[in-house]
């Protein structure tokens, strides 16, 4: 997840600083970019489970981190990128307290989304695949489609978190999104 957080952070930085997109549009767009990248890396790992899936996602981590470091023309390489603090109706969110309320509101929205997702058809399919993979497949659940969707949803959430984080710390580089961050999130 550390790599997809980095994708969201860099996507937000590129959208706001290079393309001039306002933060409030860049926030969901960076999540969408991270979701697309997550789904892209999810496709080859559809047949994998358990430890092998973990190894495949670690490979994605290293590939993404390599691209963040070596695509100087896009990410600034090891120098990183600078971003601006967002503002809300002219009020700059440049203090910890102000930014806290933004993050708190988005955490509430994310909680409501995930709570409703678990009650939906897709959420029930996720649970069925997690609990009994073969049984879900026999019952007609599109296991491949829902696994890709789960990669996309989780990457979207962490991509939005990366966007928020980038605009909080104001400077991002590939060193922020190492394998250690991914292990920290999983542990």
Per-region residue spans from a language model:
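Transmembrane alpha-helices and adjacent helix-loop boundaries
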Residues: 1-187
